[in-house]
């Protein structure tokens, strides 16, 4: 993690609680569609502080330029759409007029079950890092994971090596070997912290509870006061619902998505193997033609006739174009993302099973 962060202009991302609530609200309303928006804030002492956000307006599919674009594709590409860029610039102008942070520091998008490693995410973040502001970040909010009661908000940036390769637009086997680019080098994850102001923290501790309906006796001691059900609990009190022994339903769904990504990965590998077979057949034909032409030129030399050109094969034969390896890299990175989620789910389920093992298996 430290090696990946050494070339990043900032080391951590600090998100205001109000921004996290805005992102969660917009993502929940748009679910199962994607919700995207812009982030504003400032960088201070190696920390990217995100202090405000605003969602992008919904794109009408009837007024879109492309006839084949679906609503999902338009929503995913919203951060780099021309109308949304103009909308974001206008919003930042208004924010500057009211004297609040008005620096574009990135964008956010919602996802489900960690399914965000795709070409749209890469193109959006590349646009922000290369054209708007190099010091930008992408916040990924997982609606499905957050519905379990734990905020799932992650920050990512494109690595410098991947940005260089993406600018060149060459993702062939030779270019990947020269640059030593791996699927682990596509995205760099940054630690995220949620920040509350002191006033908000004080308010959380002073929130009144519901008034009792009958007169209560004065508690004789502190222990009785702590055991009183009418005593308000402190904020962020532990939630014991997480101790439920039922198998997490998201584990099964994540496994299905993992298998689907593996199938897509095998499809890309089969396409590349087909290209290699086609290339080998063409190279065999070219080699046979060159040997035949050399034999003809040897006979012409013996008979003192003019030689035939030996580079004519370039006009007669056409080598197949190598398919881009970018999709394979993205599929590999998505498989890794799902594997991490399965590992996290399995750890919680396994610990619960070991905790109740003595009650489930008699005699142990």
Curated annotation (Swiss-Prot):
It is found in: Cytoplasm. This is Eukaryotic translation initiation factor 3 subunit H. GO terms for cellular component: eukaryotic 43S preinitiation complex; eukaryotic 48S preinitiation complex; eukaryotic translation initiation factor 3 complex. The lineage of its organism: Eukaryota, Fungi, Dikarya, Ascomycota, Pezizomycotina. It comes from the Eukaryota. GO terms for biological process: formation of cytoplasmic translation initiation complex; translational initiation. Residues 13-162 form the MPN domain. Component of the eukaryotic translation initiation factor 3 (eIF-3) complex. Component of the eukaryotic translation initiation factor 3 (eIF-3) complex, which is involved in protein synthesis of a specialized repertoire of mRNAs and, together with other initiation factors, stimulates binding of mRNA and methionyl-tRNAi to the 40S ribosome. The eIF-3 complex specifically targets and initiates translation of a subset of mRNAs involved in cell proliferation. InterPro entries: eIF3h, eIF3h_C, JAMM/MPN+_dom, JAMM_MPN+_peptidase_M67A, MPN.
């Amino acid at each position: 993690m430290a090696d990946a962060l050494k070339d990043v202009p900032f080391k951590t991302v600090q998100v205001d609680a109000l921004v996290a609530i805005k992102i969660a609200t917009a993502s929940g309303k748009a679910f199962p569609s994607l919700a995207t928006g812009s982030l504003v804030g400032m960088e201070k002492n190696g920390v990217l502080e995100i202090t405000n956000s605003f969602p992008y307006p919904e794109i009408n599919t009837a007024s879109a330029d492309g006839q084949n674009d679906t609503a999902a594709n338009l929503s995913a590409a919203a951060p780099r759409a021309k109308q949304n860029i103009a909308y974001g610039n206008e919003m930042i102008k208004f924010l500057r007029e009211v004297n609040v942070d008005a620096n574009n520091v990135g964008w956010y998008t919602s996802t489900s079950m960690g399914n965000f490693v795709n070409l749209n995410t890469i193109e959006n973040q590349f646009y922000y890092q290369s054209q708007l502001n190099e010091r930008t970040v992408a916040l990924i909010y997982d609606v499905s994971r957050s519905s379990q009661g734990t905020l799932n908000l992650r920050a990512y940036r494109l690595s410098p090596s991947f940005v260089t390769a993406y600018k060149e637009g060459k993702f062939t086997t030779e270019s990947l070997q020269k640059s030593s680019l791996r699927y682990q080098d596509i995205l760099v994850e940054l630690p995220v912290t949620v920040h509350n102001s002191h006033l908000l923290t004080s308010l959380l501790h002073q929130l009144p509870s519901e008034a009792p309906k009958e007169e209560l006796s004065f508690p004789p001691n502190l222990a009785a006061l702590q055991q009183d059900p009418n005593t308000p609990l402190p904020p962020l009190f532990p939630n014991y619902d997480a101790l439920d022994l039922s198998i997490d339903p998201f584990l099964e769904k994540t496994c299905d998505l993992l298998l689907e990504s593996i199938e897509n990965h095998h499809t890309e590998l089969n396409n590349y193997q087909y290209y290699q077979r086609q290339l080998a057949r063409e190279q065999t034909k070219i080699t046979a033609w060159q040997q035949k032409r050399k034999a003809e030129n040897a006979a012409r030399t013996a008979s003192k006739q003019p030689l035939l050109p030996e580079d004519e094969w370039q006009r007669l034969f056409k080598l197949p174009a190598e398919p881009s390896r970018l999709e394979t890299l993205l599929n590999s990175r998505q498989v890794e993302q799902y594997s991490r989620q399965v590992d996290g789910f399995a750890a919680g389920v396994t610990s619960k099973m070991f905790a109740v093992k003595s009650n489930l298996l008699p005699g142990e």
